Amino acid sequence: AIRWLRAHSSKYGINKKKIAVWGASAGGHLVGMLGTTNGVKDFEGTVGKFLEYSSKVQAIINYYGPSAFLQMDDHPSKINHRSPSSPESKLLGKPIDQVPDLSKQASPFHHVKVNLPPFIHFHGTKDPLVPYHQSLILHEAMLKQKNESCLITVRGGSHSMPPDFTDQFVIPFLDFHFYSLGSQIHSQEIKQKR
């Protein structure tokens, strides 16, 4: 998809040097993988017509995506993530604990290294499906490698984010990184609005 966008950038008015990806839940996992495997040849693949174009992205917006499959059951959740019927096990084709190497390969947390694009993570502390810990450990791993990462913690928040977060955080995050406008968004905790 990223290569396709670059190949058609002039037709759609896309700046090839400023591509951000945004995903929630399973989509958050996918954008986390895109960001942490940015430029890793083994993850480039050979599918599609536009292999001459880069699949690198320049910013990641992660809404409560899984980041370390094998640690998901270490924290409260309504899902038994090690079950054969869990979303993570279905993705891998087997229960995650039966394929630990594949589980790690499919987890953004295990691909964090230096020189990654900036991330902003959003996660509720009461998320019943993807434990808050998933964004926290990815954020901390990013910082440990001197990458830019911001975590917006929603105290009492569930598996969703308020629509006003787009204007409050996402647009300013992109403005700062892509256009040097405004100020940098910093990690913070917000109470869930009732």
Label every model-predicted segment.
Residues R3-P76:
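Primarily recognizes the serine-hydrolase "nucleophile elbow" in alpha/beta-hydrolase
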Residues K16-K18, S55-A59, L116-P118, Q145-C150:
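Loop/turn elements at helix/coil->beta-strand transitions in domains of secreted/extracellular proteins
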Residues T36-D42, G48, Q71-H111, P117:
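Mobile cap/lid helix-loop segments that gate and shape the active-site cleft of serine hydrolases
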Residues N115, I120-H123, D127:
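Short beta-strand/loop motif that positions the catalytic acidic residue
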Residues P128-I137, M161-P162:
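Conserved alpha/beta-hydrolase "acid-adjacent" motif
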Residues V154-M161:
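Histidine-bearing beta->alpha loop at or near hydrolase active sites
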Residues F165-R194:
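Catalytic active-site module of serine/aspartate enzymes centered on a nucleophile-bearing elbow/loop
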